[in-house]
C-alpha cells in the first residue's frame, strides 16, 4: 500500500516515539524529510540525525532529546498543509507559532526553512507543520 502523506507519517512517528520516551527512531529517507530533520536538530528539538544508506531509499535515524527529569523537549507537532488541503502563506503572512516559542516549517523555493528564516529572507511558501 502506498503512503499518501510521508511527512505526516514522519511527524506521527516522532510524536509517538516522544510520548513513550524512546531514545531514537528510524524512518524511510527522502530529501524533504532530511531537510526537516536538519531543521529540528538546528533548532534544538532533537539531539542528532544520522543517514543510513541501504540498497533502497535509505533510512533517517533521529535521536530524540529530553530535558532534566526526562521531560520532553518536543511538546507538540501539528501537520498544517495536507495533500487534500494545501496551505500557503505570502512572505508577510508567515505565522508565528506560540508567539515565537515554536517554529513553523515552510517549504519555499529556497528549500525547507523555519518561519523566522522565511520572514528574514522575505519569502513565502507552503506551511508544512508547526513544532513546539
Curated annotation (Swiss-Prot):
Name of the protein in question: Small ribosomal subunit protein uS8
GO molecular function: rRNA binding; structural constituent of ribosome
Role according to the record: One of the primary rRNA binding proteins, it binds directly to 16S rRNA central domain where it helps coordinate assembly of the platform of the 30S subunit.
Gene3D superfamilies given in the database record: 3.30.1370.30, 3.30.1490.10
Pfam family, one: Ribosomal_S8
Keyword rRNA-binding applies: yes
Position of the signal peptide: none
Oligomer and partners: Part of the 30S ribosomal subunit. Contacts proteins S5 and S12.
UniProt source species: Staphylococcus epidermidis (strain ATCC 35984 / DSM 28319 / BCRC 17069 / CCUG 31568 / BM 3577 / RP62A)
PANTHER family: 40S RIBOSOMAL PROTEIN S15A
Family statement: Belongs to the universal ribosomal protein uS8 family.
A GO BP entry: translation
Amino acid at each position: 500500500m502506498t503512503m499518501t502523506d510521508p511527512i505526516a507519517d514522519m511527524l506521527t512517528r516522532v510524536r509517538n516515539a516522544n510520548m513513550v520516551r524512546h531514545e531514537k527512531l528510524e524512518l524511510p529517507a527522502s530529501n524533504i524529510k532530511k531537510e526537516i530533520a536538519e531543521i529540528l536538530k538546528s533548532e534544538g528539538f532533537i539531539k542528532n540525525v544520522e543517514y543510513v544508506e541501504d540498497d533502497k531509499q535509505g533510512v533517517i535515524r533521529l535521536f530524540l532529546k529530553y530535558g532534566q527529569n526526562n521531560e520532553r523537549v518536543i511538546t507538540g507537532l501539528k501537520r498544517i498543509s495536507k495533500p487534500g488541503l494545501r496551505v500557503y502563506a505570502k512572505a508577510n503572512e508567515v505565522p508565528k507559532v506560540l508567539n515565537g516559542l515554536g517554529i513553523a516549517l515552510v517549504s519555499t523555493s529556497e528549500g525547507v526553512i523555519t518561519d523566522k528564516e522565511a520572514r528574514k529572507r522575505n519569502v513565502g511558501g507552503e506551511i508544512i507543520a508547526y513544532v513546539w
